Amino acid sequence: MSKDKREALSDLEHQQWAHWTKYMLEVLRPVLGLGFYEARGSGMEYNPNIVKARESLRRWHRQIETPYADLSEKEKDSDREWADKVLVALEAAP
């Protein structure tokens, strides 16, 4: 397996992920107006799950705007994992 081919596929995987995720987040934007608190009973209660979702949204938006070449190695590894699956599928194809 060529390292250049793997990196080219990894870059493409990132572009595909970014395109889909950007679209999905735009569609879901009306329901993703997350605060840190949620209504519970007669008051507002801190919800750590909402905080985690908010942090994930920030990370995803940053990753969407970041070209593959500028991602961290850990982030690139996620795209490389999918590129490797494509390479295996291509090698197995008749």
Roles of regions detected by a PLM:
Residues 1-94:
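Alpha-helical propensity feature that highlights long, continuous alpha-helices across diverse contexts
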